[in-house]
Amino acid sequence: MVRKLIFLTAFSLLLTYGVEAAGKGFAIVVDQSTYTACKAEIDAYSTLLEREGFSPSLLSGEWKQPDELRQQLHHLYLHHQLEGAILIGQIPVPMIRDAQHLTSAFKMDQERFPKRDSSVPSDRFYDDFDLRFDDLGSDEEEPLLHYYSLRGDSPQYIQSDIYSGRLKPTRQGEEGYQQIRSYFRKLLLEREQQNPLDVVVAYTGEGSFSNSLTAWRNQGMMMREQIPAAFRNKSSAKFLFFNMYPYMKELVTEQLRRMDLDLMLFHEHGTPDRQYLTALPHTKESEEQMEAGRRLFRQALRRAGDVQQQEKLKQTWMELYRIDTLWFAGADDPKQRVADSLLDLQTGIVLDDVPLISPNARMVIFDACYNGDFREERYIAGEYIFADGKTLATFANSVNVLQDKSSTDLLGLLGLGFRIGEWAREINILESHIIGDPTFRFAGDVADQVDLRTTDTAYWLALYNKADHPDLKGLALHKLSDLGYPGMAEFLTKAYNESPYYSVRLQAFLLLQLYGGDHFAQLLEKSINDPYEFIRRKSVYAMGAIGSDHFIPYLVKIYLDNYLDERVHFNVTFTFDRMDFDAMEAEMKRQLDQNISYPDKEKVWEEFQHIFASRKRIAAMANDVTNREKPLKSRISAARMLRNNNYHKQV
């Protein structure tokens, strides 16, 4: 098999193709300097792909803007069966603007905030060829960053044509080249192993899912359906919760270092440089509680800066909390500052921790904000793959991400031998990215029996009916939906009503939202009581998004009866202002009067009124959109608020 070689420069374009080879196309994209420094390792990777049935193309050059590269990838897709690409080294970073509706949560004012901060680093620019953009130019200080605006005549949804992965080093110069060389060496060693996906660890950090134990417990039930091989003994599937121990960092580190660990899944808050595992430990000891309070005061005083501001804060706190100056002692003491800093480091994993941990999980999923922000020189997801352990790929987000987003959709495909990229292509959002080799896969022979390229709806219908694994059924539902199978809304409704699997019902639920008619609204009356907490959570959210007063009795009942499902209960409060205020209040009073579970109904009513009043104040802001007496700035702000708040009556 002859490898295809493509050299690109800013001034010339030279395409040199070898004899056309059968098989799936794959593009190895690398800047010229990196290829020169890492040629042996990159060529060895290409040879590995050839052995696995790919027809790899090497694209090496010095790109000034992403458009040149996108055109070449599109050409390979149209004419050479391109399936995926890996972007190695200093490859231009598309910074997408005017596409926040394609993100799960990112909503930042593009006029008020700097362009760099209010754009989304996204390789959907490279792997979804139907999206259309206007070129806004490169960043003046960081020319690797290139800004694009999503056009109004572009598709307003994501449906990636190929899959992609990034291999951007977290060090500069020779150190960065060494990272890439070392990565490919360990990748080649691991790819020689036939390693099944049968050891999984999931960690839920403080603040995730409103600290709901129900949500935490249900993820184990879901993953047992998806990855049954991991549930063979007490150590092969572990689900850790932030309050199992005062500081969980050491326990998490131990799990990451396990030589047999295949998949690590983090549900946590994050930044480019940190994973937040825990906050202040919960304790019943009064002295520990007081010390935690003193530490918070010290941290706030240090952030305040000048002495005058510190004294002002102290006076405010002493009057408000009736405390003395002893609560602030040590704020300026260097030894106390170091002690507080060391304690703070116990609450999370920072950039410099990762090389010391040397994580061995072959794949790590970060269900977190910003851990995959590859516009930064160093970022958590990158540090994981370049550490000395066995981690080969991470799946992470380049900006903030919605907590109420399913992070394990179709995850069972990985255990069946599908490549990480094949899985990610089905579930991509604007901010999600593979960091590392997208062709990596765990051992399994089912994937080779599934033709992902076919557009024959009869094939996918047969797969849905015959498949034993629930995520194969879920994949079939996705393909049938993408291909426009007639009567899909009815088919999805039937799939939800008949399937015993959490994962199949979830995919049917999520896909049914894309169709008009009454099918989805009618399904919500049943799905709001689904055994799977995440479906209940999303059902509540969907009722609020639809905004029909018909749902008021259902939402009130959930609010009063499901207070132990913290995240579901939390989502209900965000629906109070989406429907008729008087009807919502009257129904709450009616059901509360009939409720026999609450010993103090007056307190429950007061809590509802407090939340209800707050939501009504927020809803009132939406009226500014049409109020010509308001300043233009206020009206624009109100219009932006509608992106996350579906106020149908005001619109």
Task: Please give the residue ranges for each predicted region.
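Loop/turn elements at helix/coil->beta-strand transitions in domains of secreted/extracellular proteins
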Residues: 23-26, 51-56, 80-84, 195-200, ...
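Catalytic cores of nucleophile-dependent amide-cleaving enzymes
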Residues: 116-183, 291-406
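Caspase-like cysteine protease fold
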Residues: 407-494, 502-507
